[in-house]
Amino acid sequence: MAKMIVFNEEARRALEKGVNTLAEAVRVTLGPKGRNVVLEKKFGSPLITNDGVTIAKEIELENPIENMGAQLVKEVATKTNDVAGDGTTTATILAQAIIREGMKNVAAGANPMVLKRGIEKAVEKAVAEIKAIAKPVESKEAIAQVAAISAGDATIGNLIAEAMEKVGKDGVITVEESKGFTTDLEVVEGMNFDRGYISPYMITDPDKMEAVLNDPYILITDKKISSVKDILPVLERVVQSGKQMVIIAEDVEGEALATLVVNKLRGTFTCVAVKAPGFGDRRKAMLEDIAILTGGRVVSEEVGIKLDSATIDMLGRARQVRIKKEETIIVDGAGRADDIKARIAQIRRQHEESTSEFDKEKLQERLAKLAGGVAVIQVGAATETELKDKKLRIEDALNATRAAVEEGIVPGGGTALVSIQKALDNVETPAGDEATGVAIIRRALEEPLRQIANNAGYEGSVVVEKVKSLPVGQGFNAATEVYEDMIAAGIVDPAKVTRSALQNAASIAAMLLTTEAIVADKPEKKDAPAMSPGMGGMDMGM
């Protein structure tokens, strides 16, 4: 296919046009008085959202060169979302501002490579300053504030803070769609996995269709149990102790299953069999997790323990095990705290070293199950359109909160970026284009605050100048339209979100400024469809 090649100023201007088209669609959503954007869906109702990355992902432009510019800014939003989970609109606005100011200077004769060096030095200094002014997030109130600002809803903020309090900062918090109108929090305490009882005859509570065993012994094995002979020695010891028993195995079938069911129905002995969770190597790892949590051992021939030689000392213990049709919950396992901590540290290391997103997600789940349970936020709304928007907002708020716990918080509402401008005075650069690069970042740092003010119906430049004259930490509260201490007012941003937005925006913008030629596919001219015979003058007897 033939290519078109565009050079110099013409190339940069076309890219900038694409950048501006995407950024203008996204920037209207910033701040407490930001508007929504409606996205057409080929199937189902349109999606109404104010989530920057969701809007950016939908945008494809007709002109191939302008589309390249839009795709580059889309990468800014996507990368920021991947790293920090929020701040995508801020990142897009920063990228647009850096590109706009940079283009002016390149057009006036500045050397793009020297400008890029100045931009990089300024960003390095700004990031160090963001880290320096960040305050750690420890209290439930601070967590609620971060989540409320991100979601634009105090109720959601409180819900996320409550979820984090219950499952811990490493705990898994999932967001699911509910059938009702209200948004609720459901906490599953202890370790849970998605396998239930093998036979419904094993239930102890017919009303709830579940088996609840208090203070049971837990046999954990990766073997398939078909013959009762294999487990008879350990079964006899458990029966003598008068306790109940849970068997977690690859499967329990045939004679072994029949024996357990008959004894349960006769009231002789309660034993519930559950299939082991996961598959392959992940199953072995999860069984090991359960063993450490309950203070037992995995009975496996791989470690030299045969099923018929298992002793009662190898069994795990827990305060309670609840088993439903498709879920098992182990509450308060009897494992040693030091062993559990060591296992958590090991999984955390694996999580850091893993390059697969799927593996990371599964390791995070295992981490949470060992660390303290799973919280589920059930999102409810009157219509499907509202439900989708609400779910996106809650997911954003959850990501922002995790980022805040990780690296702390800074004053929100674009205030932190304006306040770190002063730090750029200390960047050592030779006069000329490198100093201009620093000035470009200094000017771009004002842009998010300017846009928040514009969206609230104020003159952005006036608000920016006013905030610059205020003490550090004070800014413009667009929700109440007053100037106040942002952290005291609960208007905060996660430092990680602010840092990632600036770094990603500057990275893509600097690359774009140094572009001197663009190669793109030539759009194909589509021939007009041939008219069908007899349609010429539309006479045909009419």
UniProtKB/Swiss-Prot annotation:
Descriptive protein name: Chaperonin GroEL
Reactions accelerated catalytically: ATP + H2O + a folded polypeptide = ADP + phosphate + an unfolded polypeptide
Family of this protein: Belongs to the chaperonin (HSP60) family.
Function description: Together with its co-chaperonin GroES, plays an essential role in assisting protein folding. The GroEL-GroES system forms a nano-cage that allows encapsulation of the non-native substrate proteins and provides a physical environment optimized to promote and accelerate protein folding.
Annotated gene: groEL
Record organism: Heliobacterium modesticaldum (strain ATCC 51547 / Ice1)
Main location as per UniProt: cytoplasm
GO CC annotation: cytoplasm
E.C. numbers: 5.6.1.7
Alphabetized Pfam families for the sequence: Cpn60_TCP1
A GO term, aspect molecular function: ATP-dependent protein folding chaperone
InterPro entries: Chaperonin_Cpn60_CS, Cpn60/GroEL, Cpn60/GroEL/TCP-1, GroEL-like_apical_dom_sf, GROEL-like_equatorial_sf, TCP-1-like_intermed_sf
Binding site for ATP: 29-32, 86-90, 413, 477-479, 493
